[in-house]
């Protein structure tokens, strides 16, 4: 009889300590093994030299360390790396963005997305399922293995993690929170809570739960300054409108030390849709009572979508209006523009190729059956 092995990447420190107690071991074994897994990227129990041989054998029999595998990799001339990683028989997208003073990893929380935002490449794929804890933290583990695990000292290969990949993170809280705990844990990736960021489209009840259970940086996908426009772009706005959303944000930042009293507002600029100077004034007035920093994101076009990227002059005019109101504003740099730019596009391309392959295979089988 085969015993299903426990994937240790599914367990935060508390869960791992309980696991070792069940094995009849001391709880401190959890910290020993975590250092091997997360500080050194180790997946072979035999290499864990400070773990006794008897326990290593026991672990080989009942546990495993399994992370998503790389299916497709794209490397940009600017150093950006985009991966399609396999999770079961599906794929999610993970992006590594190195800069002079930091290295940010953008990870996914779901296979596809249920929210159907009309500017999003991932939304075109529909929703399949939530990722497990191991599939979320495993993206960090796999990326760290590729870009260089440094152990106890040396420059960190990943300094920031953002939940801005495929999926709505707050619709997968039960798995997201333990994964983020591993990012923050000293025996995990030991990241500062200001360097772990969750982005949400506005699942207000889950935002309240998040604030009660963990403290990380918050970014919100706003993208419009009135409900009429936002509902056109984001169906979730019909359930939780802008006023409800911003009220939830204020409750979160009142609890949070990671945000230092401010939230990051993400505003996607769509050419001649939400990028006029009048709309910039409207946004500035809307946010006057919300302590925030604003991140303007020029749209990255992708096949099958009619929105266009605004000109630099339109972006500059929008930015100037906000700055005149005293806001701190950044314009997101275009990174990796020589590889698939839009979030979800790489996995979308993989899915399209897979569908074409399956179609050809089925056509071949039909021909064979007909010939028989």
Curated annotation (Swiss-Prot):
Positions contributing to S-adenosyl-L-methionine binding: 167-168, 199, 221-223, 300
Note describing how the cofactor binds: Binds 1 [4Fe-4S] cluster. The cluster is coordinated with 3 cysteines and an exchangeable S-adenosyl-L-methionine.
GO terms classed as biological process: rRNA base methylation; tRNA methylation
Domain Radical SAM core: 99-338
Cystine pairings recorded for this chain: 106-343
Primary location group: cytoplasm
Pfam families the record matches: Radical_SAM, RlmN_N
Required cofactor(s): [4Fe-4S] cluster
Catalytic activity: adenosine(2503) in 23S rRNA + 2 reduced [2Fe-2S]-[ferredoxin] + 2 S-adenosyl-L-methionine = 2-methyladenosine(2503) in 23S rRNA + 5'-deoxyadenosine + L-methionine + 2 oxidized [2Fe-2S]-[ferredoxin] + S-adenosyl-L-homocysteine; adenosine(37) in tRNA + 2 reduced [2Fe-2S]-[ferredoxin] + 2 S-adenosyl-L-methionine = 2-methyladenosine(37) in tRNA + 5'-deoxyadenosine + L-methionine + 2 oxidized [2Fe-2S]-[ferredoxin] + S-adenosyl-L-homocysteine
Active site: 93, 343
Miscellaneous field: Reaction proceeds by a ping-pong mechanism involving intermediate methylation of a conserved cysteine residue.
Family recorded in the similarity comment: Belongs to the radical SAM superfamily. RlmN family.
Protein name: Dual-specificity RNA methyltransferase RlmN
Organism: Psychromonas ingrahamii (strain DSM 17664 / CCUG 51855 / 37)
Gene: rlmN
